[in-house]
Amino acid sequence: MGQGIAKAFAQVDGYEVALCDIKQEWADGGKEKIKKGYARLVEKGKMTQEAVDAILAKITPGLKEDLCADCDLIVEAAFEDMGVKKTTFQELDKIAKPECIFASNTSSLSITEIGNGLTRPMVGMHFFNPAPVMKLVEVIRGENTTDEVNDKVVAIAKEIGKTPVEVKEAAGFVVNRILIPMINEAV
């Protein structure tokens, strides 16, 4: 999912993307997968190589401790494990500049709990697969999410061509809260 989110931002003018992972080779591999995906679009005539090169030039793979100090927005896309997400943001809280916005791409975990103990407000920014194509983004407000942070993330979602849906923190947020009962009914 992180690769798709990186593409969603890099495809828009004005955004530079730090594609971070816990190992440099994993981050490099993520950019390589992005590159291969775009190569297929060039082969099919859906994009020019020049356009692809411009997008790829805006994606820098690396480690959070090397790339996140100057970020304005960090969208975390680790797997759905509360401990992993909390630890990731606690580490980022020591690295990122004070005005950096922290957003989690969680599909169901508590934004409030993820953000407890941080020095800044936390917000949810839940993309849907495939992130570069799907227009919907849930913007989830936790107990400590300020109006300023919420409004900024809504504006950013619009800037990158998404349709933000603002939701309060609740189990499954909006989409999964509707989707799961529908799937259960179908089964």
State what each model feature region is.
Residues 1-40:
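NAD(P)+-binding Rossmann beta1-loop-alpha1 motif at the extreme N-terminus of oxidoreductases
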Residues 14-15, 137-170, 180-187:
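Internal alpha-helical scaffold of NAD(P)-dependent oxidoreductase catalytic cores
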Residues 81-155:
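Rossmann-fold NAD(P)-binding glycine/threonine-rich loop
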Residues 25-36, 54, 84, 148-159:
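A non-catalytic, amphipathic alpha-helix used as a structural packing/dimerization or gating element
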